[in-house]
């Protein structure tokens, strides 16, 4: 599967409808973004079962702001509607493969449990347990 252009109009639906979504926040004027693009495209072909989205931060400033994107490129991975990875910087192919493998290996029941515990603690005004 090739990459999908994500906009504020299709972002939520894409994340809701797919179990595993990678998101590349980028801009056309960004040199590292242009260097990362072929690496990302190749990974999208290798992992055709996953959705590889791209957010043009110039055209989708509202979306970039909603995620607090401060530098580009930034790669984010969302599994089961939970952001499980977010990191600025262009990754080499090997590092991208490693990150995808780690995200695939996550026990999402544990992730959802940790999120629920953190939200409950936050609702009580407590700090989440850093040890998880």
Range-by-range predicted roles:
Residues 108-126:
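CheY-like receiver
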Residues 61, 67-76, 91:
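Structural micro-motif
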Residues 19, 26-29, 71:
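Short pre-active-site segment immediately N-terminal to redox-active cysteine/selenocysteine motifs
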Residues 18-22, 35-55:
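Conserved helix-turn-beta segment immediately C-terminal to the redox Cys motif
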Residues 3-21, 61:
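A short beta-strand-turn-helix
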Residues 76-110:
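Non-catalytic, surface beta->alpha helical segment in thiol-disulfide oxidoreductase systems
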Residues 30-33, 75:
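The canonical Cys-X-X-Cys-His
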Residues 24-26, 77:
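Structural cue for short, hydrophobic secondary-structure segments
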């Amino acid at each position: 599967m090739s990459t999908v252009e994500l906009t504020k109009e299709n972002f939520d639906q894409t994340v809701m409808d797919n179990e595993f979504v990678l998101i590349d926040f980028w801009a056309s004027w960004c040199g590292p973004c242009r260097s990362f693009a072929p690496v990302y495209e190749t990974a999208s072909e290798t992992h055709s079962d996953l959705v590889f989205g791209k957010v043009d931060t110039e055209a989708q400033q509202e979306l970039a702001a909603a995620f607090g994107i401060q530098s580009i490129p930034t790669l984010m991975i969302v599994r089961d509607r939970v952001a499980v990875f977010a990191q600025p910087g262009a990754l080499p192919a090997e590092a991208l493969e490693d990150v995808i493998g780690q995200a695939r290996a996550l026990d999402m029941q544990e992730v959802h449990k940790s999120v629920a515990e953190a939200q409950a603690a936050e609702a009580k005004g407590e700090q989440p347990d850093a040890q998880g």
